[in-house]
């Protein structure tokens, strides 16, 4: 992604704004999952809608970063970590969410990374790999957390990063579709404030992330490194243990 474009945020080798987005994603994910340990905290579902789109934005920013990978796109090591923790995280995820109807979020992020990378690069092999990931996302829609639209969200963010601000609508609409659940729309039609809060947060989350990525935080932001991969399955285990006390 050319750093000279006035329509695109500058993605540096160690971007404090990107680290801030990752911290916010981790924090809101933890806040969201507290409701699985303590059901009375169900209202935390609303701020929890921030987490997934922020993770997807982080993926898009990494794909867009010119120094990632051999040709400015997919890092095999990055993909490998996501694949590894997709497997590691499934049992802790189901330990906390025993009635889960989907896989943990990591497989969706893996597919999203492959699709976004195909949108970034012109290599025929990469394009075929992205097409295969898209086909898997469509076929496995019912088993993926956030479904096929969730797998498309990193690519939608990538287009928003590369294009004019009018394209910011793409990740906003995609995020809303990824969080689609018919009862919310029924409740929203009845004027239920909780349902409207959820739908509003789904539209707000991508906008917040894109705005944050363009800012330079006036304070030091600790880098988010590989420990974050371990945090995902570990926080499931900790919450499951706390629930059993």
Model-assigned labels for residue ranges:
Residues 1-245:
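Alpha-helical transmembrane segments and their immediate juxtamembrane cytosolic regions
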């Amino acid at each position: 992604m050319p750093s000279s474009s006035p329509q695109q945020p500058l993605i540096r080798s160690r971007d404090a704004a990107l680290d801030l987005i990752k911290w916010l994603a981790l924090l809101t994910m933890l806040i969201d999952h507290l409701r699985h340990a303590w059901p009375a905290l169900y209202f935390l579902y609303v701020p929890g809608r921030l987490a997934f789109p922020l993770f997807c934005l982080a993926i898009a920013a990494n794909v867009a970063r010119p120094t990632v990978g051999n040709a400015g796109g997919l890092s095999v090591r990055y993909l490998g970590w996501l694949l590894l923790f997709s497997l590691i995280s499934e049992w802790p995820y189901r330990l906390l969410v025993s009635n889960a109807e989907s896989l943990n979020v990591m497989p969706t992020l893996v597919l999203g990374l492959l699709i976004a990378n195909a949108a970034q690069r012109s290599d025929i092999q990469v394009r075929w790999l992205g097409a295969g990931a898209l086909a898997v996302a469509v076929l496995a829609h019912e088993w993926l957390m956030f479904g096929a639209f969730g797998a498309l969200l990193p690519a939608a963010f990538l287009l928003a990063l590369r294009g004019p601000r009018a394209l910011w609508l793409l990740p906003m609409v995609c995020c809303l579709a990824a969080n689609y659940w018919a009862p919310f729309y029924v409740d929203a039609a009845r004027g239920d404030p909780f349902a409207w809060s959820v739908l509003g947060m789904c539209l707000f989350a991508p906008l917040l992330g894109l705005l944050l990525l363009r800012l330079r935080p006036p304070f030091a932001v600790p880098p988010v490194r590989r420990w974050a991969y371990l945090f995902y399955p570990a926080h499931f285990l900790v919450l499951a243990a706390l629930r059993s006390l």
